[in-house]
């Protein structure tokens, strides 16, 4: 850390230890939603006060040691010679003992939507160009040897290590830059528009830097260090925060060729001036009342909680990549979308509508309209919003993961909480456990999900739980049954690298309290027996057991439905076949259970026979060994 004004003395050296305080902590707490109903937070703490002799400045480093790793952060007490200061760079280093295997994506100031590369640390620099397999309109790749967190590592002798951060608040997002010669990762903070790596004020703290360690890969998945390093819930009444299973007007546009916009008449749009009542509809706008009612009926028939509708509001004809700030007002619907009628229709069927606020990354415009937009939601009965930040930040110069944008994303979550609104953040900074403090942050994207279709690599969903999901749940949008996308859009000649039962398993392995049932209703109606699993699977859990795992190879997880005796087990693999082997000792002894087993058929093939599956029932018990096949 380095001050900016009239002070060339860094916070790197010339320190002596002024004080050391130790303590212990052990408490069990209950999350509003989660992978288990009880989480134990047990650690030993050491707070080391360092005094810089020349300037007589103090900095405290606080360490918390857990059974499965540690967290540490920097703290800056109030003092005479340190009040406001600029961070030029944080120089935290993680020194490795060998050339470990790394599971990584390129460092980027604006996106995490990459496929993962598995390589030795020493190979990262040489593989970087190949690893940059997706540069969207907002991408800003950092350099030849920078990677993102959470970073998963494996030593040659089989130790698993995870590097990340927790409680990212009022601070830029951290990347890691590799010094290959010294086998050391150094923190690399996302700069703001003028190049600063942070503007801090004493008293203040950095986010926690986390190291999770396990002798088995599944130990990493079971760790709750990230959540435990965040503050307890700050929302007094959480009764309105509900895990949600939903359908949506979304896949029709993402994969099917439908449109978010309403007309082709206007080459440019001015909100408040463009008269849509005089426009001729182009006929491909999917967020129309008739189509939305179809999804509402489908949700009601199958017991789903809500319907997401994207493209309902004016402005989509001219919304991104034009350096345009006033692109949406978040309250004016297109002429073919009746807000009042649709919400009344949905509520009459015990279904909610989920609001969509795409910002086009014009974040200041969103902040100006946020109160009005949230009031509009409450007026019509919306209690959840999916936000989006596609494209470069407007005004230009900021990055998605800079301190100002981290603060913006947090502002949205806290403002939404005041209106009792749940948030599903897309294109936002990757999670760091903030959902413990603000559990209305019920979903995040922040990684490559199903919307990438054929560009979701084999094994991708076996590495995401070790990386992206370490910080919080992901809105991966599973449940695609028609995996040959040319069948829904003749112009799209691609197949997803998946099978129907693979898509079912993701509801268990890719944890989220907000799960989308993403495909067309008619594609589920073609496979009612497989669809039954999606109807049955829970979205909130009493207990999770990580049965077996190896990044990029396989993953098997068992979860017990909250408030029920039902268990769900999901398993996925990478490119190589895998026979799951585990015990059912997570079941209650003395009880017999009936298992409904959904599995790929013997001739299932993700390239040529994606929709073949088998379903059978069999009895299992506490002593049952191996997965039923």
Spans of model-derived segments:
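An acidic-aromatic substrate-binding cleft motif
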Residues: 204-292
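Solvent-exposed beta-strand/loop surfaces of large extracellular or lumenal domains
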Residues: 37, 106-112, 597-621
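Catalytic domains of carbohydrate-active enzymes, especially glycoside hydrolases
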Residues: 291-310
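N-terminal accessory beta-strand-rich subdomains and adjacent acidic, glycine-rich linkers
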Residues: 2-236, 604-605
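Catalytic cores of secreted or luminal carbohydrate-active enzymes
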Residues: 506-542
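Aromatic- and carboxylate-enriched substrate-binding clefts and catalytic-loop regions
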Residues: 310-499
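Conserved small/polar residues in nucleotide/adenosyl-binding loops
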Residues: 1, 623-628
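Carbohydrate-binding surface patches
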Residues: 551-589
């Amino acid at each position: 850390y380095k001050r900016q004004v009239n002070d060339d003395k860094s916070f790197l050296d010339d320190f002596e230890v002024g004080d050391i305080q130790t303590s212990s902590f052990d408490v069990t707490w209950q999350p509003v939603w989660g992978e288990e109903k009880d989480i134990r937070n047990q650690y030993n703490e050491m707070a080391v006060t360092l005094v810089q002799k020349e300037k007589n400045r103090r900095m405290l480093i606080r360490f918390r040691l857990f059974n499965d790793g540690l967290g540490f952060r920097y703290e800056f007490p109030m003092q005479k010679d340190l009040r406001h200061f600029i961070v030029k760079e944080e120089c935290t280093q993680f020194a490795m003992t060998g050339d470990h295997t790394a599971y990584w994506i390129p460092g980027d100031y604006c996106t995490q939507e990459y496929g993962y590369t598995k390589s030795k640390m020493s190979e990262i620099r040489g593989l970087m160009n190949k690893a940059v397999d997706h540069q969207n309109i907002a991408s800003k790749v950092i350099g030849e040897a920078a990677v993102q967190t959470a970073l998963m590592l494996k030593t040659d002798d089989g130790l698993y290590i995870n590097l990340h951060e927790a409680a990212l608040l009022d601070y830029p997002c951290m990347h890691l830059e590799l010094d290959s010669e010294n086998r050391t990762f150094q923190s690399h903070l996302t700069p703001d528009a003028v190049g600063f790596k942070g503007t801090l004020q004493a008293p203040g703290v950095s986010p926690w830097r986390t190291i999770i360690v396990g002798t088995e890969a599944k130990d990493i998945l079971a760790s709750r260090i990230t959540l435990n390093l965040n503050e307890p819930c700050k929302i007094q009444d959480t009764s309105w925060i509900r895990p949600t299973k939903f359908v949506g007007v979304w896949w029709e546009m993402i994969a099917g060729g439908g449109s978010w916009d309403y007309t082709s008449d206007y080459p440019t749009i001015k909100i408040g001036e463009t008269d849509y009542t005089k426009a001729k509809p182009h006929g491909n706008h999917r967020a129309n009342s008739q189509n939305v009612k179809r999804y509402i009926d489908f949700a009601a028939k199958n017991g789903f909680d809500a319907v997401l509708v994207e493209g309902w509001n004016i402005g989509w004809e001219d919304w991104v990549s034009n350096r345009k700030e006033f692109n949406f007002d978040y309250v004016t619907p297109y002429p073919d979308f009746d807000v009042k009628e649709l919400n009344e229709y949905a509520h009459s069927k015990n279904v909610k509508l989920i609001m969509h606020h795409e910002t086009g990354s014009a974040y200041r415009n969103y902040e100006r309209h946020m109160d009005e937009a949230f009031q509009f939601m409450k007026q019509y009965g919306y209690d959840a919003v999916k936000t989006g930040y596609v494209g470069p930040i407007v005004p230009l110069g900021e990055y998605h993961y800079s301190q100002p944008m981290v603060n913006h994303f947090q502002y949205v979550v806290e403002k939404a909480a005041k209106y009792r609104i749940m948030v599903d953040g897309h294109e936002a900074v990757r999670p760091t456990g903030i959902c413990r403090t603000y559990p209305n942050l019920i979903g995040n994207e922040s990684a490559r999900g199903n919307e990438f279709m054929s560009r979701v690599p084999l094994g991708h969903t076996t590495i995401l739980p070790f990386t992206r999901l370490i910080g919080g749940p992901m809105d991966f949008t599973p449940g695609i049954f028609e995996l040959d996308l040319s069948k829904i859009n003749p112009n799209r000649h691609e197949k997803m690298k998946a099978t129907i039962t693979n898509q079912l398993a993701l509801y268990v392995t890719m944890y989220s309290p907000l799960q989308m049932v993403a495909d067309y209703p008619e594609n589920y109606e073609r496979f009612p027996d497989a669809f039954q699993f999606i109807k049955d699977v829970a979205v909130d859990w009493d207990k999770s057991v990580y049965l077996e795992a190896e990044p990029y190879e396989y993953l098997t997880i068992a979860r017990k439905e909250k408030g029920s005796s039902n268990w769900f087990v999901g398993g996925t693999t990478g490119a190589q076949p895998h026979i799951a082997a585990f015990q059912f000792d997570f079941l209650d002894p003395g009880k017999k259970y009936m298992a409904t087993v959904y599995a790929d058929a013997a001739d299932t093939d993700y390239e040529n026979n994606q929709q073949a599956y088998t379903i059978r029932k069999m009895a299992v018990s506490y002593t049952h060994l191996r997965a039923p096949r």
